[in-house]
């Protein structure tokens, strides 16, 4: 664990942006009697399919009674960190050029201000990988269509419910295996000569029976067999985050179990659509797939340096009834 902790890295670049401040605070800004909230994106520009950190420092922190937001259609779960509020979010794999976060700051007395902040998005390389799999996993028979649809809906519901779970983790995330990465996130997979999908996770080498560990504290949301994913474990870490451990040979946890960071949860296998034994590790923020290796470097409590943002454009907002 000590070695894993030494591997944690926090990006040093920080991007400050404030585009629009709307509402009573904005009106005060226009009259020169209040300062704008300061915002920080980490990283300053993001790859498609990445996890990002958004921090906001309100003009008057002790007057804030609530803060809500959304990015790419997924809610943001802000938490106070000193006089700031911070939240993780996700950039869709199909995003182009930029994404926009919308944040509502609720103040005392019922007043609220809305801030809109864009984040630059960079294209993720998508190399192609040719693989051979059993024909039934490339073009499943019609008789399995209902099963595949039901399983897709089940996994989607697990991801959605993670937004209803409070954040359960406090330690840094760790890798599920101390092994080489053999498959990268975002690769285009060509099975039996047919383009089937993007690779929405990271593969780790491992012989059948090798240990697989939980990458952080959470509640086991699913244990079972899925057509494409084989024997799988999904862990709800709360605040929108879910991790999955696929193609296992066996599992050591049950739905509803609370697992600790680094706890043994299963063993490497070759179940589902695979070309050989390995672990497929995935991470999702709500319904958005992100590179799970981004979890290793995320730190909600990392010290950030705020500076003055650009001048805000303001207009009068909704007044309390």
Whereabouts are the PLM-identified features?
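N-terminal secretory signal peptides that target proteins for export/translocation
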Residues: 1-9
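Short polybasic linear motifs
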Residues: 3, 14, 319
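Acidic, Ala/Val/Gly-enriched low-complexity intrinsically disordered segments
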Residues: 9-10, 316
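Bacterial N-terminal signal peptides
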Residues: 11-24
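Sec/Tat signal peptide C-region and signal peptidase I cleavage site
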Residues: 26-30
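Non-catalytic extracellular/periplasmic "stalk"
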Residues: 32-185
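Catalytic cores of peptidoglycan-degrading enzymes
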Residues: 174-317, 321
């Amino acid at each position: 664990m000590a070695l894993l902790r030494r591997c944690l890295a926090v990006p040093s670049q920080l991007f400050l942006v404030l585009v629009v401040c709307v509402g009573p605070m904005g009106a005060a800004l226009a009259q020169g009697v209040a300062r704008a909230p300061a915002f920080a994106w980490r990283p300053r520009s993001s790859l498609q399919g990445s996890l990002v950190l958004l921090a906001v420092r309100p003009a008057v922190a002790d007057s804030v009674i609530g803060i809500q937001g959304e990015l790419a259609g997924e809610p943001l779960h802000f938490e106070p960190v000193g006089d700031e509020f911070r939240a993780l979010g996700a950039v869709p794999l199909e995003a182009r050029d930029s994404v926009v976060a919308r944040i509502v700051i609720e103040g005392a007395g019922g007043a609220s201000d809305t801030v809109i902040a864009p984040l630059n998005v960079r294209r993720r390389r998508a190399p192609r990988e040719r693989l051979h799999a059993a024909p039934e996993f490339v073009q499943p028979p019609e008789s399995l269509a209902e099963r595949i649809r039901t399983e897709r809906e089940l996994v989607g519901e697990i991801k959605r419910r993670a937004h209803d779970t409070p954040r359960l983790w406090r330690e840094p995330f760790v890798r599920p295996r101390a092994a080489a990465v053999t498959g990268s996130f975002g690769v285009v997979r060509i099975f039996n000569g047919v383009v089937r999908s993007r690779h929405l996770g990271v593969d780790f080498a491992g012989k059948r029976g090798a240990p697989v560990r939980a990458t952080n504290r959470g509640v086991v949301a699913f244990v079972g067999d899925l057509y494409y994913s084989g024997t799988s474990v999904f862990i709800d870490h709360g605040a929108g985050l879910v991790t999955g451990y696929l193609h296992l040979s066996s599992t050591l946890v049950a739905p509803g179990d609370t697992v600790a960071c680094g706890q043994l949860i299963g063993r490497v296998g070759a179940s589902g659509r695979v070309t050989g034994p390995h672990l497929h590790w995935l991470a999702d923020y709500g319904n958005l797939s992100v590179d799970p290796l981004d979890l290793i470097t995320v730190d909600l409590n990392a010290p950030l340096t705020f500076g003055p943002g650009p001048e805000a454009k303001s207009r009068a907002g909704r007044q309390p009834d």
